[in-house]
Regions:
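An exposed, glycine/acidic-rich loop-and-rim segment of catalytic or binding clefts
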Residues: 1-172
Length: 172
């Protein structure tokens, strides 16, 4: 979880996020992926240009409304033909306040981005600070969520997370 502003008492929606992805996997009201792969174009899911997170949040958009922020998987453009380019930036987070830039690299096909939608419980944390909702951003590189179910259902375009006997798994 990252709050590059250095102030955990304030939400992190003023951080600038970039995600190198033309598509994302929508989730239902229980946060289970629907099996669709949708374009980000023209939606609040489009972070192909670095943008302040708060400028994209639109609670009338069903995906944002259901999750009360971002908790979604993006289908990375850095993953093609079953291979990920771990030398290319797949996502980044920047704080104009601190000047800190975080760059994310992975060989995985997807990245789950979570904006602390269930933080802000009022529980005192480090130094007695009560973290607000949306205080931080988390990047989780991964296969697409609910992969075993979607593969079993024959969903096209879904990445398989099955580790077969004798095979090695390596993720970075």
């Amino acid at each position: 979880y990252f709050n590059l502003n250095g102030d955990p008492s304030k939400e992190g929606f003023d951080q600038v996020m970039y995600i190198n992805a033309d598509k994302f996997t929508p989730a239902d009201s229980l946060y289970i992926p629907t099996g669709e792969i949708k374009d980000v174009e023209g939606t609040p899911m489009d972070f192909r240009t670095p943008t302040e997170i708060g400028k994209k949040v639109d609670y009338s958009f069903d995906q944002i409304k259901n999750a009360t922020g971002y908790d979604h998987n993006w289908c990375l453009n850095t993953y093609k033909d079953g291979k990920g380019d771990d030398k290319a930036v797949c996502a980044s987070l920047y704080s104009p306040k601190s000047g800190i830039l975080l760059e994310v690299f992975t060989n995985e096909p997807g990245i789950q981005v979570y904006t602390g939608n269930f933080q802000g419980t009022g529980i005192a944390c480090k130094h007695g600070i009560k973290y607000p909702k949306h205080v931080s951003v988390c990047f989780e590189s991964q296969k697409y969520p609910d992969s075993p179910t979607k593969i079993a259902q024959g969903v096209k375009g879904w990445t398989d997370a099955t580790l077969k006997p004798g095979k090695k798994y390596y993720s970075h």
